[in-house]
Swiss-Prot record:
Gene behind the chain: pdxH
Keywords tagged on the record: Flavoprotein, FMN, Oxidoreductase, Pyridoxine biosynthesis
Name recorded for this polypeptide: Pyridoxine/pyridoxamine 5'-phosphate oxidase
Family label: Belongs to the pyridoxamine 5'-phosphate oxidase family.
PANTHER family, per database record: PYRIDOXINE-5'-PHOSPHATE OXIDASE (PTHR10851:SF0), PYRIDOXINE-5-PHOSPHATE OXIDASE (PTHR10851)
Gene Ontology molecular functions: FMN binding; pyridoxamine phosphate oxidase activity
Organism in which the protein naturally occurs: Shewanella sediminis (strain HAW-EB3)
Record function comment: Catalyzes the oxidation of either pyridoxine 5'-phosphate (PNP) or pyridoxamine 5'-phosphate (PMP) into pyridoxal 5'-phosphate (PLP).
UniProt subunit comment: Homodimer.
Length: 213
């Protein structure tokens, strides 16, 4: 068995310099996201880790797809009865991480998650493929199930039920916007001298600090 301690590589794709940074982190995130989408080395550039904590302070993470972002925040959709939603109801402070390994980059975001309005959720829900809309009705996310067959049987049942017409929006399905309080950009550097810049939200705008790697 190979030793994990022997696995290493150099980071050589480029650096990040403070004089090149925009005053608004969303501008830099938009640029990096566009580059991630245009690259041919990332299959899921919008995939992000969403970290929440439960009532006991136990953290949990899961991969969720980013569906929209702007100066107001970062949007994702989910089952409102899921573990993540239950934890957000207890503590709305969350963390997001975009691990763009192939580009030697990552973006870490902290902020508060706020529920989206039903109108905002519906606007997105109707754009989903019909099978995905049906799947939203099928899965009681994070609950225990006896076997995959139970899930597939329920899907077949709901597919028949909604075979004619539009699939209605489940009351237990919605979304959140994470309003950022900090955004950190990490760019890999040679000899582990990585570039890290932290944008911290202030009343007058954003403070930018370089962090030691």
């Amino acid at each position: 068995m190979s030793k994990l301690s022997d696995i290493r590589r150099e980071y050589t794709l480029g650096g990040l310099h403070k004089e090149d940074l925009p005053g608004d982190p969303i501008e830099l995130f938009s640029k990096w996201m566009e580059q991630a989408r245009d690259s041919e080395v990332l299959s899921d550039p919008t995939a992000m880790s969403v970290a929440t904590v439960d009532a006991d302070g136990q953290p949990f993470q899961r991969i969720v797809l980013l569906k929209r972002f702007d100066k107001g925040g970062f949007v994702f959709f989910t089952n409102l009865e899921s573990r993540k939603s239950q934890q957000i109801a207890i503590n709305s402070k969350v963390s997001l991480l975009f691990p763009w390994h192939s580009l030697e980059r990552q973006v870490a975001i902290t902020g508060e998650a706020e529920p989206l309005s039903t109108a905002e959720v519906m606007k997105y829900f109707i754009t989903r493929p019909k099978e995905s809309q049906i799947a939203a009705w099928v899965s009681k996310q994070s609950s225990k199930i006896s076997a995959r067959q139970a899930l597939e049987s329920k899907f077949a049942e709901m597919k028949a039920k909604f075979s004619q017409g539009e699939v209605p929006l489940p009351k237990f399905w919605g979304g959140y916007i994470v309003k950022p309080t900090s955004i950190e950009f990490w760019q890999g550097g040679e000899h582990r001298l990585h570039d890290r810049f932290l944008y911290s939200k202030e009343n007058s705008g954003w403070d930018i600090s370089r962090l030691a790697p």
